[in-house]
Amino acid sequence: MTTETEKRALEDDTVESKRIKYDKGIAPIKPEFIVENPSVPADDRYVNDDDAEAGDRNGEEKGKKKKRGQNKKRDMRQQHEEVRLCSSLLDPSNPGTCRFGPEHCRSTHDVTTYLAAKAPDIDGVCPVFKSIGYCPAGLKCRWLNSHYEDGKLKRDQSQIDAYASSGQGEVNKISTEAKLALQKKKYLFEVSDNVIKYLDSQVQSDENIAKREEAKENNASYVEAPFKIAEKKKLDLRGAKIVSPLTTVGNLPYRRLMKTLGADVTYSEMALSLPLLQATNSEWALPKAHSSEYPGFGVQIATSKHWAAAKAAEVIYKETTHVSELNLNCGCPIDLLYRQGQGSALMEQPARLLRILKGMNASSGDIPVTVKIRTGTKDNKNTAKSLVERVLAENDVAAITLHGRSRQQRYTKDADWEYIKEVGAVVTEWNNKKEEDKESSETNRTNFVGNGDVFTHEDWYNAVNTEGVDSVMVARGALIKPWIFEEVEAQQYLDKSATERLDILRKFADFSLEHWGSDEYGVGLSRRFMCEFLSFTHRYIPVGILERLPPKINQRPPQWRGRNELETLLGSTDYKDWIKITEMFYGKTGDNFTFIPKHKSNAYESG
């Protein structure tokens, strides 16, 4: 006969056996979706946000080669067609002029030979032709049969007119004249030249002041700036849905996609000031934006010199038309930039940072200047608070963004939102003083934006409701889950089906072909950037297979299977599956396609 005590013990054992134990840092996936004896080690399956911030600018560390870790020296080149057609013959019915002449041109002028050697067309209608009514790639298009008939390229005039009237297209393209002037060092920097002279004198003055001890002498050495800063456009980021500047993955098609998914503010990939001033084509491709991004598009630059910052600010102001803010990167943690005194290294040189901001502010016309920083450069030594106090006192910045991690910490720990709150209080106090001061009350308030670990609508609202925080900048969360701002708007979790997620990728594919082109080279480039995108999106775990909410961005899952084959495919960590997904939009990979991801555990070379 079982006693009452024994019954209770049996009940306790039953409850204990049903209770699921969760390991810290492991995503709580329902048991029926967990794969037993996984083929892929958990260690190799996850990357961190450095990949988004560093992109392809990271430096290779000296020492022994490792089989794991980042592929920092990645070859990004994509091969062209074996038989190339001269660009003057893209439209044979309306040929252009070849500057080399048919006899000296390295590309063929024989259309028949080119078409015979060209790879088979991809099935379906050309996404670019469907969108804008014609295809700029002409005969080189991989979907040529959809808009080529009887030896002529088709044009849908009604679609061309509709696209033109919509005002869509890419903006912020530098003119050929300006580019040549920069390359020949004949560009007129009418504003920044005067600003630089003043800042140079301030550097000398600072060195002299450091040698003096009496405050009166210091005050006497102050020289009024010989220029007036232009009135800036108003920048109000309160409650704005902001996508962080992201290198490589933060390209134009991705940002355009995010605008369709609810983003209010986007930023260019980080551009280096010196290559901008040298008119490097690859660098000037970065400030380009889609018209849908403006207003709300910011250009981010990195620099270590005040003269380069001032000149870059002036040329961006003069040569672009759709820029809402100019952002200085003082948060990038990668070694290459840090060793050059750029990115987060500026936090260790406050005087230099302040000069750079002054130069940008004075040279950027009506474009407001903003800055992105970290808590500091070293663990357990936060310096952002004192730095922000100096920035507010000595510069009129429109916004300060604080990433709640140090450079040294990277992503080993959660973002420090308590410290973000502390710094936010400093900015709030400053704004309140400005409102009370009649002389400065007419100047725009300084926005304060937090950044770090926002992955759900709950994270977003918790952050925005933090005292002193105007809005939140989302980085990894917007890469892993591009519809995060739809969740913010709905204030609930959205369990997107695999088909819906595939539609998001399809939209990215269409945007990428419009941007990079539908020829062989453009398709290869688009495929590569979709693979980069998938290196983040595959990390999303559908909320419908989780035991409990909320999901955390730093949680690592055991290997899992989806609710259908497509969901499993979209969550695959295998690079071969990423390639398979791209083939749904860009056709089969050719022998000339290569993809080397950031992590050495995944690499692909066709053939």
UniProtKB/Swiss-Prot annotation:
PROSITE patterns: UPF0034, ZF_C3H1
Ranges annotated as biased composition (Basic and acidic residues): 42-63, 72-84
Residues the entry annotates as binding FMN: 245-247, 300, 372, 403, 451-453, 475-476
EC number annotated for this UniProt entry: 1.3.1.89, 1.3.1.-
Keyword field: Cytoplasm, Flavoprotein, FMN, Metal-binding, mRNA processing, NAD, NADP, Nucleus, Oxidoreductase, Repeat, tRNA processing, Zinc, Zinc-finger
Enzyme class, first EC level, given as a word: oxidoreductase
GO function term, MF aspect, one: mRNA dihydrouridine synthase activity
Presence of keyword RNA-binding: no
Family: Belongs to the Dus family. Dus3 subfamily.
Name of the protein: tRNA-dihydrouridine(47) synthase [NAD(P)(+)]
Organism this protein belongs to: Meyerozyma guilliermondii (strain ATCC 6260 / CBS 566 / DSM 6381 / JCM 1539 / NBRC 10279 / NRRL Y-324)
Gene for this chain: DUS3
